[in-house]
Every structure is written in C-alpha cells, then in structure tokens.
Amino acid sequence: MHIFGKILGAFFGLLLGGPFGLLFGLFIGHQFDKARRLSQAGFSTGGFGKGPSQAQRQEEFFKAAFAVMGHVAKAKGQVTKEEIQLATAMMDRMNLHGEQRRAAQDAFREGKESDFPLEDVLVRVKISTAGRFDLLQFFLELQISAAFADGAIHPSERNVLHKIARGLGFSSEQLERRLQMQEAAFRFQHQGGFHGQQQGQYQSSGWQQASQADQLADAYKILDVSPEADGKTVKRAYRKLMNEHHPDKLMAKGLPPEMMNVAKEKSQEIQNAYDLIKKVKGFK
C-alpha cells in the first residue's frame, strides 16, 4: 500500500489548518502517492521540459500492457494457472528475454496489487499513444485476449474490461462488440482456423456441415459483419480491419517493436477469416 503521502499530508494539514486542512492534506498526499506509485512502476508523471521520446512512450505502452493484464487476471480474486500461462506465452510470442522479460513480469505483478492505479495508468497510455485509435484498440484487444485465457470471461473480468474501455475512450457497445469478435476468434483458432481445416477434413469430402457452419459463423463475427452481407460489404469490412491492424502501420504510429509478432498474428487471423468466407461463398 502506498499511503505515506496521505499520512504526511493529513498530519501537516491538520496541524496547520484543522479539519479543512486535514482534508486538503489528504488530497495532496493522495496525489503524491499516485505519482510515486506510477514512477515506481516505470511510468512518466509529466512535468516541465521536453515530452517523452518515442522510445519512452513505447516503453510506457509496453509496461502498461502487462500491468493492466495482471490487473485483469486478478479481477476474479485469484490469478489462475491459465492466466499465468497466457502471460508467459505472450512474452514468448514477443521473444522477450533478459531485462525485457523481467520488466514484463514485474509489470504483471504490479498490476495484481490491490492499490494498482488503473485509471492513472490508462491516462498515461492515452498520452503515450497521443490518443491514436489504432494503438488504443490494440491495447484493449490485448486485454480482452488475456481475459479469454481460460476460454470464458468472468463477470468480474468483464467489469474491469468495461473500466479499461471507458478509460481508453471506448463505449460499452464498442467493447461488447470486440468481446464477441474475440470469442469467435478464440473458437476459430482452437478449431484450426481456415488454413488448419484445409490440411485435414477439407481435403477430400469437405467439412461436416455443422463444423463448416460454425467456422463460417465465427469468421463473419471476426470481421464484424452479418452472415447475410454481400461480397462488397465483407471486403469493405476486411479492408477496414486490416488497415487498423496492419503491423507496419501500427509500428509507424508507435507500437513497441516487441509487440510486432502479436500484431502480425492478429492480422493473419483477420486474413484467415476473410479467406474462409471467400472460399465458402465464392467471393472474388
């Protein structure tokens, strides 16, 4: 717990200004504790002079991603084995070793603390990304992916995700839509996806109808379009998502280089869903 500032502020506030001074001292002390906590977690707290460099902004984004991931994992009261495995797998996907891996692990542990300043960290994320929609969306989707570590969203995790979405500037409707997309992506991936199915059932007699229908339904949800959508609508949705998730474009906007592989996997997921719809529906 970080309460040193509150205690000190309350003491001097009461000493110098009575009850009103006590309240003012508590407020000032609280601000001090928040700034100290953010600084210890590796986040810039602003101030005068030059703003953070690109490398510093990327570092903030990186640490915040793992810290908030830890906060989501702790939402149910206890971090599960699956959630720890997902965080470890995420570090593996990013090829994190040595200092980088330790920084990610430290941030994840920081996020699990009961007094983790979620709202303040999200403010820092918005500042470090200059409010760029694509980067904020990537950050939110990363947290959603973490919440799906065990294949389902717990109500407590959903509540935390709503706080994260609001803090980043997304509406509840936008979050729920992304939750549906991620749930479909989770099923799509664990069923082998389009290219995985091509290697097996589809080679000779095709998929079983139920399997094909489920895969196709998930592919439409990944692209966030209706199953009744025509080819032009599907292609437009595909291009929009690819433009928002293109790894090179995200890197140019400030995505940490360590997260490039995760961005590539997301764009491949979108590509696979589009390829499946084209194959089954005969779109060109």
UniProtKB/Swiss-Prot annotation:
Keywords, alphabetical: Cell inner membrane, Cell membrane, Chaperone, Membrane, Transmembrane, Transmembrane helix
Residues spanning the membrane: 7-30
PROSITE patterns from the UniProt entry: DNAJ_2
Any Pfam family the entry gives: TerB
Periplasmic side: 1-6
Source superkingdom: Bacteria
Entry keyword annotation includes Protein transport: no
Record membrane topology: Single-pass type III membrane protein
Gene3D superfamilies in the record: DnaJ domain, TerB-like
SUPFAM superfamilies: Chaperone J-domain (SSF46565), TerB-like (SSF158682)
Compartments reported by the entry: Cell inner membrane
Segments on the Cytoplasmic side according to the record's topology features: 31-284
Annotated function: Regulatory DnaK co-chaperone. Direct interaction between DnaK and DjlA is needed for the induction of the wcaABCDE operon, involved in the synthesis of a colanic acid polysaccharide capsule, possibly through activation of the RcsB/RcsC phosphotransfer signaling pathway. The colanic acid capsule may help the bacterium survive conditions outside the host.
NCBIfam families: PRK09430.1
Domains as described in the record: The transmembrane domain is a dimerization domain.
Subunit structure: Homodimer.
Protein name stated in the entry: Co-chaperone protein DjlA
UniProt organism field: Vibrio parahaemolyticus serotype O3:K6 (strain RIMD 2210633)
Protein's gene: djlA
